[in-house]
């Protein structure tokens, strides 16, 4: 009978470390792909804070031809109404096509009640040429919670040649308001 001490095996420790780093790298890559189309924010007052999220996904992310470089939300309270402005910075990495329109969805959750308050589609006509970066923005006015968590998801990106991109998965926010699950449409 051969006894093997796993705790003292340098080779086994290195192999497990490589396996662990490889698995973590794949998970990070999958989440980074979803960051191209999904962001999560917390609003308490005027400005938003982007929240770290856990993303679970059924499918594989595809190449987009663009990157959601940055996104931010700003809120102005006007009595019982709140004006919410979303600003997206899009980088066009497609070598040939010009982006002409960006559409996104905001799912606004009441942080205190952990429930969906509003779902809003926003769109902006833009001209983002190949290799350039541009801004898409839109405003809404609605009765919104004082403290909210907002899930932003790109819905459609249209190009000048008539083609359009839309995600293969639709994402939703979990009950903990931190976990995003993406499922095939």
Language model: regions and residue ranges:
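Asparagine-centered strand-capping/turn motif at beta-strand->loop junctions
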Residues: 90-96
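Short, solvent-exposed, Trp/other aromatic-anchored flexible loops in extracytoplasmic proteins
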Residues: 118-164
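Sec/Tat signal peptide C-region and signal peptidase I cleavage site
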Residues: 26-30
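Bacterial N-terminal signal peptides that target proteins for export
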Residues: 2-16
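Hydrophobic helical h-region of N-terminal Sec-dependent signal peptides
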Residues: 16-25
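Short acidic, flexible loop segments centered on an aromatic residue
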Residues: 96-112
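Low-complexity, acidic Ser/Thr/Pro/Gly-rich terminal tails and inter-domain linkers that flank the onset
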Residues: 31-87, 179-182
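Surface-exposed edge beta-strand/loop patches
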Residues: 109, 149-185
């Amino acid at each position: 009978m051969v006894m093997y001490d796993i705790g003292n095996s340098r080779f086994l420790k290195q192999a497990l470390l490589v396996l662990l780093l490889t698995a973590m790298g794949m998970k990070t890559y999958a989440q980074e792909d979803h960051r191209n189309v999904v962001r999560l924010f917390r609003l308490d007052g005027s400005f938003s804070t982007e929240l770290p999220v856990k993303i679970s996904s059924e499918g594989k992310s595809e190449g987009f031809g663009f990157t959601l470089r940055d996104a931010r939300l700003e809120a102005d309270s006007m009595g019982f109404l709140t004006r919410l402005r979303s600003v997206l910075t899009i980088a066009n990495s497609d070598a040939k096509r010009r982006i002409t329109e960006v559409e996104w969805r905001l799912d606004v959750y009441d942080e205190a009640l952990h429930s969906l308050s509003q779902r809003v589609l926003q769109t902006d006509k833009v001209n983002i040429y190949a290799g350039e970066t541009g801004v898409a923005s839109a405003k809404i006015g609605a009765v919104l919670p004082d403290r909210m968590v907002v899930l932003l998801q790109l819905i459609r990106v249209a190009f000048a040649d008539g083609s359009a991109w839309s995600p293969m998965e639709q994402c939703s926010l979990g009950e903990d308001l931190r976990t995003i699950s993406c499922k095939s449409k």
